[in-house]
From Swiss-Prot:
Gene Ontology annotations of biological process type: cell division; chromosome segregation; DNA transposition
Subcellular location field: Cytoplasm
Gene Ontology MF terms: DNA binding; tyrosine-based site-specific recombinase activity
Protein name: Tyrosine recombinase XerC
GO cellular component labels: cytoplasm
Species of origin: Haemophilus influenzae (strain PittEE)
Cell cycle among keywords: yes
Catalytic residue list: 145, 169, 237, 240, 263, 272 (o-(3'-phospho-dna)-tyrosine intermediate)
Database matches in NCBIfam families: PRK00283.1, recomb_XerA_Arch, recomb_XerC
CDD domains hit by this protein: INT_XerDC_C
Length: 295
């Protein structure tokens, strides 16, 4: 089983050029799957049948996995078994026709304009704070994913024309604009970046000079949010969701927001129309003479 997996990781890394972060996620899911199979004395991929796949999902749910994680586990297994079919090691993919439990629609949480101002109202001159402010400004200004921001190099950014070249999901490249506040914050960071003794061309580096990790970015944002007095937990998703919601509220251009976010399907972007409708409903309730509630 492990031999086939090792060939699969090489395939994803070399031929598909998948990001290390995505590969790590798949590894985690398939490692957990192998443990479940071992409990059933299944030690070969040819022994995996549709009923075994359903058992994996049921056992994973019993272990506490939520709908989103179950979908990810099934997706990782489906992709791997498809690889084995392509390699001629399996005749059919046993996941065919099996769906993960439907996920409930959870609207992303976002910050309002006042909270964003509160978040970014910090002019500390400490080099690490200058770096973190640049990360915050760029994430909110461009709506980048955590993995996209972490993967930026010095040549990815152009502060003169205020554009950043991003490698998104599926190794797709897109160019995203950013605002003057983000441009200024990045220029300030570039002035002090050398103090961190950078070891490569990464735009954002740790205090050890290495490319800053996903986890470090998450921890720094969380710390920054607490320090700025935000009541809610700050994370990269919240910055991206806030960017999308505020752009949609201001422009109502769903297609443009789709391009900026790097969504391949418009349906993925449409969740923000629910948020936008909530905003419009509030405006309607406050403004329309036949909607105002009696006092």
């Amino acid at each position: 089983m492990l031999t086939a997996l090792n060939r699969y990781w090489d395939y994803l890394r070399i031929e598909r050029q998948m990001s290390p972060h995505t590969i790590t996620n798949y590894q985690h899911q398939l490692d957990a799957t192998i443990k479940i199979l071992a409990q059933q004395d299944i030690h070969a991929w040819t022994q995996v049948t549709p009923s075994v796949v359903r058992f994996i999902l049921a056992e994973s749910k019993k272990q506490g996995l939520k709908e989103k994680s179950l979908a990810l586990r099934l997706s990782a297994l489906r992709r791997f078994l498809s690889f084995l079919v392509q390699q001629g090691e399996l005749k059919v993919n046993p996941t065919t026709g099996i769906s993960a439990p439907k996920q409930g629609k959870h609207l992303p949480k976002n910050m309002d304009g006042e909270q964003v101002q509160q978040l970014l109202a910090n002019d500390s001159k400490e080099p690490i704070d200058i770096r973190d402010r640049a990360i915050l400004e760029l994430m909110y200004s461009s709506g980048l994913r955590l993995s996209e921001l972490q993967g930026l190099d010095l040549n990815s950014i152009n502060t003169r024309v205020r554009e950043v070249r991003v490698i998104g999901k599926g190794n797709k490249e897109r160019v995203v604009p950013f605002g003057r506040y983000a441009s200024h914050a990045i220029q300030e960071w570039l002035k002090v970046r050398a103090l961190f003794n950078p070891k490569d061309e990464a735009l954002f580096v740790s205090q050890l000079g290495n490319r800053i990790s996903h986890r470090a970015i998450q921890k720094r944002l969380e710390t920054w949010g607490i320090r700025q007095g935000l009541n809610s937990h700050l994370n990269p998703h919240k910055l991206r969701h806030s960017f999308a919601t505020h752009m949609l509220e201001a422009s109502s251009d769903l297609r443009a927001v789709q391009e900026l976010l790097g969504h391949s399907n418009l349906s993925t972007t449409q969740i923000y129309t629910h948020l936008n409708f909530q905003h419009l409903a509030e405006v309607y309730d406050q403004a329309h003479p036949r909607a105002k509630r009696k006092k």
